Amino acid sequence: GIASISITPDIDTPKVLKSYAKQNEITHRNWHLLTGKPYDVVSQLSNKGFTLYTGKGDATHGGFEHSGLFALVDKEGNIRSRNDAYGNPIKFYRALEEHSFPDQIKELKEDIKILLNE
């Protein structure tokens, strides 16, 4: 499944996330939009669990900053990655917009198929 975790739980209530899902046509039963409090729990999960940056900031919506990256996690809880041309692990994908990073989306789709077949 897919878990999209809000970093602004005071703004992203279940009602707001439901509206967001409808607006963005997120209808698959295995895609979950999650929110929760306190912020520290969400921050710990993101920063230490997935090593994806989140933090409080003044210039961003809701006073929070985030990397915009996301990770694929297998059923054992491990972050899965592929390697670049030099053999270095690429742990994160940059965007969900196909027009912005078409190669990343293609790789993401390939990697999801691999995970689904395990």
Where are these regions (language model features)?
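Surface-exposed beta-strand edges and their flanking turn/coil or helix-capping segments
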Residues: 17-18, 46-49, 85, 94-97
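Short, low-complexity, polar/charged sequence segments that are solvent-exposed and flexible
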Residues: 21-25, 52-55, 89-92
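Short, charged low-complexity intrinsically disordered segments located at boundaries
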Residues: 12-16, 47-54, 72-79
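Structural microenvironment flanking redox-active thiols in thiol-disulfide oxidoreductases
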Residues: 1-45
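Thiol-/selenol-based redox modules, centered on thioredoxin-like
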Residues: 58-118
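Structural micro-motif
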Residues: 29-31, 50-55, 64-71
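Sec-exported extracytoplasmic/periplasmic mature domains
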Residues: 22-26, 47-51, 78, 113, ...
